[in-house]
Swiss-Prot record:
Residues 1-24 form the signal peptide. Cu(2+) 1 binds at H64, G65, G66. The gene is PRNP. It is found in: Cell membrane; Golgi apparatus. Residues 28-110 are annotated as: Disordered. GO terms for cellular component: Golgi apparatus; plasma membrane; side of membrane. Residues 25-233 are annotated as: Interaction with GRB2, ERI3 and SYN1. This is Major prion protein. Disulfide bonds join C182-C217. The lineage of its organism: Eukaryota, Metazoa, Chordata, Craniata, Vertebrata. The keyword Cell cycle does not apply.
Length: 256
């Protein structure tokens, strides 16, 4: 019996405390902001007065109406009413006048599409009608069938190109067309560049260079065609309905 009475009193006490807390939350606060008697912002009429008193009637440690440590009505560390670090009132930080930082022109944003386009265009050689320059290769070891040309190649291989010019493989019907075009443009471009430097190629040079460049163009074709077919296979795989359904289901599981 005693235990039941004690439980009832505890329940009544808990309800009373809860009701008192709810009334305290709903009860309106008198006046304005924190530790003030009226409006939170100056200039808004209120029977309780303003949060920031007029000049001449400052709060604790305010000789001239400013905030704490404010000799002339400014913000903290503001000697003359400006923003922080503003000696004579006015605009934004470090500005002595009335011009706001909002009036400054915004910096132009970098367009990501333009950046991506510039990066993609970097692989295309300017002035060569869409030809691309392949990565540097080690010059192949080739035997020409006679000791003179073999020795000549070993002694002069630095004069021959180690990169080739080419178009995308999907623009050609077979390897022979790709290699033929690759050899012609690479030899022509290298010959023109070398001639402008004051060097000339002999008939032996041209014969050896065409053979070397042909081998490099074959290597370039194999590399490019492999990458091309891998891209096509990936596109076909990810465009198939079962894969799309599976990806959609996984996204649903992650998001949901």
């Amino acid at each position: 019996m005693v235990k039941s009475h004690i439980g009832s009193w505890i329940l009544v006490l808990f309800v009373a405390m809860w009701s008192d807390v709810g009334l305290c939350k709903k009860r309106p606060k008198p006046g304005g902001g924190w530790n003030t008697g009226g409006s939170r912002y100056p200039g808004q009429g209120s029977p309780g007065g303003n949060r920031y008193p007029p000049q001449g009637g400052g709060g604790w440690g305010q000789p001239h109406g400013g905030g704490w440590g404010q000799p002339h009505g400014g913000g903290w560390g503001q000697p003359h009413g400006g923003g922080w670090g503003q000696p004579h009132g006015g605009g934004g930080w470090g500005q002595g006048g009335s011009h706001s930082q909002w009036n400054k022109p915004s910096k132009p944003k970098t367009n990501m599409k333009h950046m991506a386009g510039a990066a993609a265009a970097g692989a295309v050689v300017g002035g060569l009608g869409g030809y691309m320059l392949g990565s540097a290769m080690s010059r192949p070891l080739i035997h020409f069938g006679n000791d003179y040309e073999d020795r000549y190649y070993r002694e002069n291989m630095y004069r021959y190109p180690n990169q080739v010019y080419y178009r995308p493989v999907d623009q050609y019907s077979n390897q022979n067309n790709f290699v033929h075009d690759c050899v012609n443009i690479t030899v022509k471009q290298h010959t023109v560049t070398t001639t402008t430097k004051g060097e000339n190629f002999t008939e032996t040079d041209m014969k050896i260079m065409e053979r070397v460049v042909e081998q490099m163009c074959v290597t370039q074709y194999q590399k490019e065609s492999e990458a091309y077919y891998q891209r096509r296979a990936s596109a076909i795989l990810f465009s198939s309905p079962p894969v799309i359904l599976l990806i959609s289901f996984l996204i649903f599981l992650i998001v949901g």
